[in-house]
UniProtKB/Swiss-Prot annotation:
Signal peptide: none
Highest taxon listed in the record's lineage: Eukaryota
GO cellular component, one term: cytosolic small ribosomal subunit
Main location: cytoplasm
UniProt-listed Pfam families: Ribosomal_S9 (PF00380)
Protein name: Small ribosomal subunit protein uS9B
Amino acid sequence: MQSVQCFGKKGNATAVAHCKVGKGLIKVNGAPLSLVQPEILRMKVYEPILVAGADKFAGVDIRVRVSGGGHVSQIYAIRQAISKAIVAYYQKFVDEHSKAELKKALITYDRTLLVADPRRMEPKKFGGHGARARQQKSYR
């Protein structure tokens, strides 16, 4: 059984993608890609497919499980997991040249498709409304 497992992360959201030989199905939490919510961000999930070309995804099935974070971070985690999974699949079961070509196309379009965003939320501290913001002080 030819399959690879990759993950994508953004904020607190984690998406795990299983990529195996199939007939071009891509499912997120058991539902097809066309049902991803919110609708405005649906094209963000389609980006790896549009950039790489639908022909690259024709022979594989990708199942994605996503949890944690909010709507936007989950969308970014999903697209990263899909991109990383297809690159890993091409490296393992197809030739190295097409993998390098695919990786180059994805990175030129958007680096976050393959490289995780290291930014994390800074915890709030006392004496203010946020992590750095302080309450206003009066001297007289």
